[in-house]
Amino acid sequence: LANLGIKSKALGYTAGFTGDFIKKNLYDEGIESDFVELDGITRINVKINNNSKETEIAGLSPKITKEAEEKLIEKISKLQKDDILILSGSIPGSIERNIYKKLAEMLPEGTKIVLDTRGNLLKENLNGNFLIKPNIAELEEMFETKLSTTADIIKKCAYFLERNVKNVIVSMGGK
């Protein structure tokens, strides 16, 4: 967003030296941040791509306490009409599974939600989102079928539009 000249603020959790690295890089790029600090270190994920296959190794996340969860909810509760909230990734095990729905319900009318997640978490949180962004593998996983043509992909995206999602972007991975 900053590269497009759009002011934004990064919210979430950070911990330890990896959290400091993230905050410094955001600062260097002119992006405001307001993270909730946790004990431990922000997890490191590694992706290995050997042209025909991508392997992901996900590190362990720090524990998110109820107090830390409430601090982040408080920060998000300050969003206003016409703000955009991006909810991305999985939900850590220590946080209620319905947190995305809870956040959506507390936002003022006119706040847009961009949802970038997968599987049941995506299915359970569709109503009224401004944008969702599954990749082709996530779409195939969700519908339990291979999507070989653009027409197949468009047909499956109708499912989201029927659930009041305003925009769907399907990234094609390495294709």
Predicted feature residues:
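Substrate-binding N-lobe of the ribokinase-like
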Residues: 1-41
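Short acidic/polar active-site loop segments enriched in Thr and Asp
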Residues: 7, 82-83, 166
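Short beta-strand segments
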Residues: 12-13, 37-38, 47-49, 58, ...
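Gly/Ser-rich phosphate-binding catalytic loop and adjacent alpha/beta segment
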Residues: 36-44, 65-68
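Conserved phosphate-binding/catalytic loop of the ribokinase/pfkB sugar-kinase fold
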Residues: 48-81
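Short beta-strands and strand-loop turn motifs
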Residues: 56-58, 82-90, 116, 133-138
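Short, small-residue-enriched loops and turns at beta-alpha junctions
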Residues: 62-65, 91-95, 121-122, 141
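Conserved phosphate/ATP/ADP-binding segment of small-molecule kinases
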Residues: 98-175
